[in-house]
């Protein structure tokens, strides 16, 4: 290696380790770098082999102050990869299919194998089918196995067939919380005892949660993650780093959720897509690691690549609290201090060089929620009722629903669970304590328990139409809620544990009670969900719930009792059985109350007990049987696991490159089209093309499961692409998964229209607005359009991960020039488009688009690096990896 001269010994306790001493570069620029850039530099120095990583890459990172302005390209080799099952199943399917392709090309299929640690946590499969009783957990877990046995069998095969692949069984918790509490190393002990910082990329956009503990991590597309597993560095543009200074302390009634919603809005307003955000300032010292992890978790919602908190003394305290031993914590602290990556936030003079900075006084943060349709639309809690009421009749937008004024006061009497109640606009029909964003944070979980305790003591109850659920991100939460005596109070008002997984946060909210569903449908009610999740895009949480508010766990409990978001939070919230009027101060715990419970009941032994046997899984998991073979025995009759067609007919030669000629527009879309719109994860509509496919193979609607669970079958996923019932397509006469097949003038299901174009040999393109592909890091949001025949997307801007996924599938991302979009260019989507793709294409090149109406405009080709161009010329990143590995 080029920098072996920097290797030094480091004695820690009874052990002597090695490490790359970056101070040995004797370069003053090193000390000025943000800590996150130091992590990139250390990885480049350690991996510098003059092949994957060059000396000039090291210089580019060292010269970050200048190179950040020049779109300079660098490689990065993370220490490990993390997956969840919705993205993990298709990743393992791809790896299995790649083994077949390599064998068919006459090479050793064992070449397809992860070269770095890969952890896959099964957390996306469990749904809230049962709730509000003590049997809910066991019943939901039983149904999860019944629905997903074939998927789980496949994953268990993968853990045996591939080296370096750890499967964490279902029922263990949520991937990012398990990563934070157990999987993360903080500092790795590598080959020959070399120490280096932990870093990770994951196939879930909220991988960034780990940044809160000083581990550098972010989400990538599943396709890119597979390349990393096989030894390929990530190619990235060296990022700008926004320094976010925090000062002061949070006030007594404010939660970490309120803080993260404030930060999310501030950073989204600033515009940080493709940038690193690094937190500093004396205020950081007052935040627990759980608070920091909550802020880092919602990094995708504010659009940055990472939201990073360097390691400090509170990180060491957290590692101790979560059961890591003294050798571990000493190794972390002494190594990071040796390389200048350990921070003292109480030192006001600590101010690295940043691209730009912004500042927040924690004392200015007020109780907040975000919604009703986007996570960065923060609303002060005091204004929620007014904001919702106004949005009912305002023109349809991200904040409004477009009801007629005469329909805004509708109400209907329903009977549910033997109780009668009025259901109106704003009625809270889902109240969920869910998501790693908040269930990883003891302060807000204990606060939720304290609200429940006070409610029970006051004789209050949840409204009969509210579906309540508690889905902790790990078993540790259950331990401290039990130890504190708060769990029985949560159970008393219906917040029984429904499962250990993502559940409501990702749309696995399960069905509403029938009387509630009937009332909503018959009266076109705009009902609400209040959840402690991180996303609330249209159609994500539940197809019948149009207004969804992200809130802290105690607010989820409180609104289940109030029953409506259209209620003044500063007024009377409820009335006790003896007639006492209850206001917020009567039921809301102070930060001091919460801190006392946390100090007493969150213990290291709970973490050690929970994680001691986490890899064993349940009896059902242990009894799963799978073949111990290197090549997967595909079952043609399976509707869950199918060999993908991406490598069919592949040879060692590069495919020929062709222009896009006379393409039709499959969809003409607006702004903020999410990966949920493109490739939904939730339930499969009984009238959809995917449902027709399943029914044709003898699957009953009861067993359709979800699109997320079906991601191992490309036939279903191609049919589920753009199947979101809230999709707004300017080529269609109504909202939903339909489009205009331009040649015939017919409105068809999007999949059916795409098939017509494919059968006729006509390429398809997509027109879109700003932030195309925002949301989850869903590789099927690129794979699906590829299978539908989409050759290019022309958008005003792309979310980072989705742009990478498109390139990984050989779809070209084109970007309108500044100030232009489909409307300004007079495009309706009914035209045909021809786009020449030159053989000597360069990153960021301007390309002519010829329109059938005679006009010509130029777009920016959003291949940002030469490596991305190489992937495209190979037909995709996985095809590139196969050719590289068999050489």
Swiss-Prot record:
Cellular location(s): Cytoplasm, Cytosol
GO cellular component, one term: cytosol
Cofactor note: Binds 1 [4Fe-4S] cluster per subunit.
Keywords for the protein's UniProt record, in alphabetical order: 4Fe-4S, Cytoplasm, Iron, Iron-sulfur, Lyase, Metal-binding, Tricarboxylic acid cycle
Keyword tRNA-binding annotated: no
Example GO BP: tricarboxylic acid cycle
Cofactor section: [4Fe-4S] cluster
Reactions performed catalytically: citrate = D-threo-isocitrate
SUPFAM superfamilies, sorted: Aconitase iron-sulfur domain, LeuD/IlvD-like
Coiled coil: none
Gene Ontology molecular function, alphabetical: 4 iron, 4 sulfur cluster binding; aconitate hydratase activity; metal ion binding
EC numbers for this chain: 4.2.1.3
Residues bound to substrate: 84, 204-206, 535, 540, 697, 777-778
Binding site for [4Fe-4S] cluster: 436, 502, 505
InterPro entries given in the database record: AcnA_IRP_Swivel, Acnase/IPM_dHydase_lsu_aba_1/3, Acoase/IPM_deHydtase_lsu_aba, Aconitase/3IPM_dehydase_swvl, Aconitase/IRP2, Aconitase_4Fe-4S_BS, Aconitase_4Fe-4S_dom, AconitaseA/IPMdHydase_ssu_swvl
NCBIfam families in the record: aconitase_1 (TIGR01341), PRK09277.1 (NF006757), PRK12881.1 (NF009520)
UniProt similarity note: Belongs to the aconitase/IPM isomerase family.
Main function: Catalyzes the isomerization of citrate to isocitrate via cis-aconitate. Has probably no RNA-binding activity.
PANTHER family: ACONITASE/IRON-RESPONSIVE ELEMENT FAMILY MEMBER
Subunit structure: Interacts with gex-3.
Protein name: Cytoplasmic aconitate hydratase
Protein source organism: Caenorhabditis elegans
């Amino acid at each position: 290696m080029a920098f072996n001269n920097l290797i030094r010994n480091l004695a820690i306790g009874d052990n002597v380790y090695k490490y790359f001493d970056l101070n040995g570069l004797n370069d003053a620029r090193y000390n000025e770098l943000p800590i996150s850039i130091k992590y990139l530099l250390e990885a480049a120095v350690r991996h510098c082999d003059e092949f994957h990583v060059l000396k000039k890459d090291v210089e580019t990172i060292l010269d970050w102050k200048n190179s950040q302005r020049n779109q300079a390209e660098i490689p990065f080799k993370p220490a490990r990869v993390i997956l969840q099952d919705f993205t993990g199943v298709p990743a393992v399917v791809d790896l299995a299919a790649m083994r077949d392709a390599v064998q068919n090309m006459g090479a050793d299929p064992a070449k397809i194998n992860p070269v770095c640690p890969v952890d896959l946590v099964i957390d996306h499969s469990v749904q809230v089918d049962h709730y509000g009783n003590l049997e809910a957990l066991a019943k939901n877990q039983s149904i999860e196995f019944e629905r997903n046995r074939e998927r789980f069998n496949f994953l268990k095969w993968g853990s045996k067939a591939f080296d370096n692949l750890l499967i964490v069984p279902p029922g263990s918790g949520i991937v990012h919380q398990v990563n934070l509490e157990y999987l993360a190393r903080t500092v790795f002990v590598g080959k020959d005892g070399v120490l280096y910082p932990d870093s990770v990329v994951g196939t879930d956009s909220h991988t960034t949660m780990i940044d809160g503990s000083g581990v550098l991590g972010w989400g990538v597309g599943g396709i890119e993650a597979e390349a990393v597993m096989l030894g390929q560095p990530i190619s990235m543009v060296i990022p700008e780093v926004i320094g976010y200074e925090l000062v002061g302390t949070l006030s007594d009634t404010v939660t970490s959720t309120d803080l993260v919603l404030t930060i999310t809005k501030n950073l989204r307003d600033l515009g940080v897509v493709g940038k690193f955000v690094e937190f500093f300032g004396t205020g950081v010292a007052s935040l627990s690691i759980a608070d920091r992890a909550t802020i880092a978790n919602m990094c995708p919602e504010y659009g940055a690549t990472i939201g990073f908190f360097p390691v400090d003394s509170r990180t060491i305290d957290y590692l101790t609290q979560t059961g890591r031993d003294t050798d571990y914590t000493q190794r972390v602290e002494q190594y990071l201090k040796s390389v200048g990556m350990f921070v003292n936030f109480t030192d006001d003079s600590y101010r690295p060089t940043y691209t730009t900075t912004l500042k927040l006084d924690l004392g200015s943060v007020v109780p907040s929620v975000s919604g009703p349709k986007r996570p960065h639309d923060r609303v002060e809690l005091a204004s929620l009722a007014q904001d919702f009421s106004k949005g009912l009749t305002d023109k349809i937008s991200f904040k409004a629903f477009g009801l007629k004024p005469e329909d805004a006061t509708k109400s209907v009497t329903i009977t549910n669970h033997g109780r009668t109640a009025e259901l109106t606009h704003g009625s809270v029909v889902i109240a969920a304590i869910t998501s790693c964003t908040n269930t990883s944070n003891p302060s807000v979980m204990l606060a939720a328990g304290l609200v429940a305790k006070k409610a029970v003591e006051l004789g209050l109850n949840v409204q009969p139409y509210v579906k309540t659920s508690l889905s902790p991100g790990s078993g540790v939460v259950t331990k401290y809620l039990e130890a504190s005596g708060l769990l029985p109070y949560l159970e008393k008002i219906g917040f029984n544990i429904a499962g250990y997984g993502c559940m409501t946060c990702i749309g696995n909210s399960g069905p509403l009670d029938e009387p509630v569903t009937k009332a909503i449908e018959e009266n076109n009610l705009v009902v609400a969900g209040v959840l402690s999740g991180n996303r609330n895009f249209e159609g994500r949480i539940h197809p019948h719930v149009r207004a969804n508010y992200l809130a802290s766990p105690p607010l989820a409990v409180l609104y289940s009792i109030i029953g409506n978001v259209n209620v003044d939070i500063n007024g009377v919230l409820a009335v006790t059985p003896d007639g006492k009027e209850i206001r917020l101060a009567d039921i809301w715990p102070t930060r001091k109350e919460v801190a006392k419970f946390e100090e007493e009941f969150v213990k290291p032994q709970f973490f050690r007990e929970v994680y001691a046997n986490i890899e064993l899984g349940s009896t059902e998991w242990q009894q799963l049987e799978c073949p111990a073979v290197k090549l997967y025995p595909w079952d043609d009759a399976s509707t869950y696991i199918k060999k993908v067609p991406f490598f069919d007919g592949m040879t060692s030669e590069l495919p020929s490159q062709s222009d896009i000629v006379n393409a039709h527009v499959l969809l003409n879309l607006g702004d903020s089209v999410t990966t949920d719109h493109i490739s939904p994860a939730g339930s499969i509509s009984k009238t959809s093309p995917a449902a027709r496919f399943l029914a044709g193979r003898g699957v009953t609607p009861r067993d359709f499961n979800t699109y997320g669970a079906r991601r191992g079958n490309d036939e279903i996923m191609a049919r589920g692409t753009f199947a979101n019932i809230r999709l707004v397509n300017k080529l269609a006469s109504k909202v939903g998964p339909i489009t205009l097949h331009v040649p015939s003038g017919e409105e068809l299901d999007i999949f059916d229209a795409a098939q017509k174009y494919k059968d006729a040999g006509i390429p398809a393109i997509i027109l879109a607005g700003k932030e195309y592909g925002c949301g989850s890091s869903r590789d099927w949001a690129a794979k699906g359009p590829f299978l539908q025949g989409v050759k290019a997307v022309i958008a005003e801007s792309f979310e980072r991960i989705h742009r990478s996924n498109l390139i990984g599938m050989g779809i070209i991302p084109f970007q309108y020039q500044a100030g232009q979009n489909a409307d300004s260019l007079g495009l309706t989507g009914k035209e045909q488009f021809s786009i020449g793709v030159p053989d000597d294409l360069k990153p960021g090149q301007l390309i002519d688009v010829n329109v059938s109406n005679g006009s010509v405009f130029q777009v920016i080709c959003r291949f940002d690096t030469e490596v991305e161009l190489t992937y495209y010329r190979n037909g995709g990143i996985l095809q590139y990896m196969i050719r590289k590995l068999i050489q």
